[in-house]
UniProtKB/Swiss-Prot annotation:
Organism of this sequence: Schizosaccharomyces pombe (strain 972 / ATCC 24843) (Fission yeast)
One GO CC annotation: chromatin
Protein's name according to its UniProt entry: Transcription initiation factor TFIID subunit 3
Gene: taf3
GO annotation (BP), single: transcription initiation at RNA polymerase II promoter
SMART domains per record: BTP (SM00576)
């Protein structure tokens, strides 16, 4: 693949992430130009954070950055102000339910008891249909027999 094709692929993947982020924030419609601008800003921000963290690692004569380098980079670009309260808030967020759900969805759950064997959508659909079959599947719908009786009584 050419360099431009790879860049376009990564941009498209990041645009999906950005659109999902906007949707999670309650914005369900946007212009394509705005989404592309938001994606570009996000890419530049992540690039700045990673380059700054890598520079901190190189100062320490390491080839890979660690959590301390990332924290210093966050302070340098203004994401954290260096206070202990900011760090506590960040640690609470990492230990919170949002990140736990992200780990579960991505398959990085460390506790083997909470891992569920994945099922494909067709198997799940078939099992759901097997559990609810016959007249019960129309319970509390417009097709249920109880609704027909109520309609007759109202007439």
């Amino acid at each position: 693949m050419e360099e431009t094709q790879i860049d376009e692929l990564y941009f498209s993947l990041m645009r999906i992430f950005c659109s999902q982020t906007l949707r999670a924030a309650g914005i369900d419609r946007t212009k394509v130009s705005l989404l592309n601008s938001f994606t570009d800003i996000t890419i530049r921000y992540i690039r700045l954070l990673s380059e700054t963290a890598m520079a901190k690692a190189e100062v320490g004569r390491r080839s890979c950055c660690d959590l301390g380098d990332l924290r210093l980079a966050m302070e340098e670009i203004g994401l954290l102000n260096g206070s202990e309260e900011d760090v506590k808030t960040l640690v609470e967020w990492f230990n919170g339910p949002q990140v736990a759900e992200l780990r579960r969805v991505s398959g990085f759950v460390q506790d083997s008891e909470t891992q569920v064997k994945p099922k494909d959508w067709l198997t799940s659909l078939i099992q759901k249909q097997i559990r609810v079959s016959g007249p019960e599947r129309f319970y509390e719908t417009v097709f249920s027999a109880s609704n027909e009786e109520e309609d007759v009584k109202d007439s």
